[in-house]
């Protein structure tokens, strides 16, 4: 593929969203799977989520750098479920040793590991943007989805990235089965404040959809969450503690 032959059909004033729409990227991941893999809404029973294993960063960087020179592409999109902070640091360190370093961005978790020192180092090493799931931006909401981080940690990580000049995007969820109107309002207010304080460049709201590979659905089939009442394709409620053909009756 010759990227220069494909024109940009539309432009976007949001710099974070322009990465998706207008950039040309080499794609790779620093780790297979997610090192957390416990979020209630996520497909945690699938191999690409639950089987976590880091790649050899040295080989990955060398391969991407050589491929980039051949194609004339200097940007890398790290398509991890959540790029490990240590692997990002290793990648940035290798990148700094090159005369013409790559630029890279990818998906992360807003962990406490991402302090200002690490964010500055990653930015110096070529990191230009991060995207990460906040999902439900209040304490009760984060606990309900087993996110494993709290609001203070999210705010600190976002601040570190933005102060280092790294573009920052958040994924949000609405309609989670345990979410009340007040939890949704609180989540929206937190997001508003994050934008107001300049800690986010963009965000996107996703409607919660229950999938057959999620932790919540697995728990439902074992007898938990009787109030969940998920629907099969024919509109009937999927039974608990009974034989059920997921392949035929449940999408997702």
Where are these regions (language model features)?
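Conserved SAM/AdoMet-binding glycine-rich loop
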Residues: 61-167, 174-176
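Acidic/polar loop patches that form or flank catalytic/metal-binding clefts of enzymes
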Residues: 52, 74-76, 103, 168-169, ...
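Hydrophobic, well-ordered secondary-structure elements that form the walls
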Residues: 132, 170, 191, 203
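Hydrophobic alpha-helical scaffolding
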Residues: 20, 29-32, 46, 50-57, ...
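Catalytic cores of alpha/beta
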Residues: 117-119, 177-194
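Flexible glycine/acidic-rich beta-alpha junction loops that bind and position SAM and/or redox cofactors
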Residues: 140-145, 174-182, 198-252
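Acidic, low-complexity intrinsically disordered segments
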Residues: 1-55
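Structured core elements
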Residues: 7-10, 26-29, 38-43, 75-78, ...
């Amino acid at each position: 593929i010759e990227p220069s032959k494909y024109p940009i059909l539309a432009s976007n004033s949001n710099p974070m969203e322009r990465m998706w729409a207008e950039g040309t990227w080499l794609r790779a991941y620093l780790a297979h799977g997610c090192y957390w893999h416990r979020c209630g809404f996520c497909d945690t029973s699938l191999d690409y989520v639950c089987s976590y294993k880091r790649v050899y960063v040295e080989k990955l960087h060398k391969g991407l750098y050589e491929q980039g020179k051949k194609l004339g592409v200097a940007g890398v999109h790290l398509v991890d479920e959540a790029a490990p902070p240590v692997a990002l640091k290793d990648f940035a360190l290798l990148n700094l040793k090159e005369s013409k370093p790559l630029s890279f961005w990818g998906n992360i978790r807003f962990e406490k590991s991402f302090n200002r020192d690490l964010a500055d180092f990653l930015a110096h090493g070529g990191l230009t943007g991060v995207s990460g799931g906040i999902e439900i931006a209040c304490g009760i909401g984060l606990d309900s989805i087993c996110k494993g981080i709290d609001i203070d940690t999210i705010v600190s990580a976002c601040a570190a990235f933005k102060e280092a000049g790294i573009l920052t995007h958040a994924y949000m969820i609405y309609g989670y089965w345990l979410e009340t109107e007040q939890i949704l309002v609180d989540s929206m207010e937190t997001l508003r404040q994050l934008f107001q304080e300049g800690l986010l460049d963009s965000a996107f709201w996703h409607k919660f959809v229950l999938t057959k590979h999620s932790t919540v659905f697995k728990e439902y089939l074992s007898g938990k969450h009787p109030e969940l009442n998920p629907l099969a394709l024919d509109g009937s409620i999927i039974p608990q503690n009974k034989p059920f053909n997921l392949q035929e009756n449940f999408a997702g």
